[in-house]
């Protein structure tokens, strides 16, 4: 019995008579398919199997590109506009325990919130108007979380302690005006400052500022560290970096240190993982006890960065950070490594004694070896400054660079006990030019620097639009910094051009400070006091400790009467500090220094510039050139 076509077990297949009708349809099928399906590499099956990782990456790129465009179109000045789940703290906090800032909101019938100007791991910083004092302030709003509140209370205690010992606000520390609790958030009210030093570097396209401006910044920072090191304070900042050093005014070189959120007092250390990586000291990397000297290490790194435009040690991780330090300074002393708990993370013993850097996966491939990257080459001591950019400029002679190099090397001593102290740094020959300027007898304003300003002239507009926070930049990560430096020529706009090279802070007399609680450099501690503040080997006078006024002085006229120091009335004041009284040695610091020095001979005193060349390994610097300033 014949089975009709289209029936039976194989009825799904075309019969012989239908075969000829199907073939044309099959031939036409590719024409009907979408163009995207014709490429095997773009087929959905391949995208969801073999190329699944590529598919996810593409989705992420598209998502974050759209997110970035939205962020650029609507600047986040008001955190209430963000799509956050407002379910915490009765709807006042977001999912990250940060207060939801609303522009125009009024707190305590006193503070009118203007905008959000900074955010960090601690919380947020807003700009606000104080209707009671009729001034703009910066309010640091701590996260509504117990751990952050506890740490902020330590910061509050240290800030109040510093305020008690710096009632005239002349030691370059940010001034805490008051504090209060608002909707379960601790709020710290600070004076409103301007841009930070990283913004200043970005404004130079990361080519660095002049040696003259670097000197002014260094003198203020050394004075601030000397203040923090007084026995009554003994405060370790623990996170000194360009982002935490702010200009008081965008047209002046007066600065203040901010963000004491990671700080502690000597003998009350809480954390082992401190300092931002680029500025982290060897003792912190190695896990040995640390003291106030870690801030001096950070300062040495900052000064080099401010002049060259790039970090001296820009490690991508701790192993890379140590390798970059070794490239410049060599292997740390053996006694220091033998006592370090984390020494074998970076180093290994040699069979015949001594230490060498471990070859690990984290060690970068272009590592050259100990001492192969000399500081004199980084600074361009004999080649006209970094990249030869300062060749022929006044104030950038080989003698100036020799003094600067010697000061930095003393700040970057491996052993904390051998590292120069703030008092020793202020007495260094690098500041002799500042002393000469301070004795200038010309008309008002003639004491301004004669060094040309690489930032050129000046400035425009106010600072209200892009003010940095007084809260600083908390945290110990440099990942974002590394990204910004690797893309430094493609970044956003910096602060407006300033003339802070030409306008130094008013130099006024101040009460002398005792040496830091941890003791001075060995050759300073056991010498007779220096009379009349004369710099050894130079005959120059030690400059009076500079002062940061609440309102910057005009470069061509004396400050107004309300800013004049009463000691200026009458005869010129005596700016020479009396011989410092011996500071009591803190037991922890004394034990640390005894353990770390290991019988090491003391450093020689700062030499005359004419003798610095041979001692630093430089040759060919004529005596007449080295002796000139």
Swiss-Prot record:
Gene name per UniProt: Dyrk1b
Q: What does the record say about tissue specificity?
A: Isoform 1 and isoform 2 are broadly expressed. Isoform 3 seems specific for skeletal muscle (at protein level).
What positions does the domain Protein kinase occupy? Answer: 111-431
Q: Which residues form the active site?
A: 239
Top-rank lineage group of the source organism: Eukaryota
Protein function: Dual-specificity kinase which possesses both serine/threonine and tyrosine kinase activities. Plays an essential role in ribosomal DNA (rDNA) double-strand break repair and rDNA copy number maintenance. During DNA damage, mediates transcription silencing in part via phosphorylating and enforcing DSB accumulation of the histone methyltransferase EHMT2. Enhances the transcriptional activity of TCF1/HNF1A and FOXO1. Inhibits epithelial cell migration. Mediates colon carcinoma cell survival in mitogen-poor environments. Inhibits the SHH and WNT1 pathways, thereby enhancing adipogenesis.
EC class of the enzyme, as a word: transferase
Name its cellular compartments. Nucleus; Nucleus, Nucleolus; Chromosome
- Activity: how regulated: Inhibited by RANBP9.
Q: Where is this region: Interaction with RANBP9?
A: 480-520
Q: How is it modified after translation?
A: Phosphorylated by MAP kinase. Tyrosine phosphorylation may be required for dimerization.
**Record's keyword terms, sorted:** ATP-binding, Chromosome, DNA damage, DNA repair, Kinase, Nucleotide-binding, Nucleus, Phosphoprotein, Serine/threonine-protein kinase, Transferase, Tyrosine-protein kinase
- Source taxonomy lineage? Eukaryota, Metazoa, Chordata, Craniata, Vertebrata
Gene Ontology biological process terms from the UniProt entry? adipose tissue development; DNA repair; myoblast fusion
Q: Name the GO cellular-component terms.
A: chromosome; nucleolus; nucleoplasm
List of residues that carry Phosphoserine: 262, 624
Species per Swiss-Prot/TrEMBL record: Mus musculus (Mouse)
Can you state the subunit structure given in the record? Dimer. Interacts with DCOHM, MAP2K3/MKK3, RANBP9 and TCF1/HNF1A. Part of a complex consisting of RANBP9, RAN, DYRK1B and COPS5. Interacts with DCAF7. Interacts with RNF169.
The name this protein goes by in its record: Dual specificity tyrosine-phosphorylation-regulated kinase 1B
Q: List its EC numbers.
A: 2.7.12.1
Which parts of the sequence carry Phosphotyrosine?
A: 63, 92, 111, 129, 171, 271, 273, 401
Annotated motif Bipartite nuclear localization signal, positions: 69-86
Instruction: Give me the stretches of Low complexity compositional bias.
Output: 438-477
Return the similarity comment.
Belongs to the protein kinase superfamily. CMGC Ser/Thr protein kinase family. MNB/DYRK subfamily.
Record-annotated residues binding ATP? 117-125, 140, 190-193
Task: State the SUPFAM superfamilies in the record.
Answer: Protein kinase-like (PK-like) (SSF56112)
Kindly report the protein's main subcellular placement as a broad class: nucleus
Give me the reactions it catalyses: L-seryl-[protein] + ATP = O-phospho-L-seryl-[protein] + ADP + H(+); L-threonyl-[protein] + ATP = O-phospho-L-threonyl-[protein] + ADP + H(+); L-tyrosyl-[protein] + ATP = O-phospho-L-tyrosyl-[protein] + ADP + H(+)
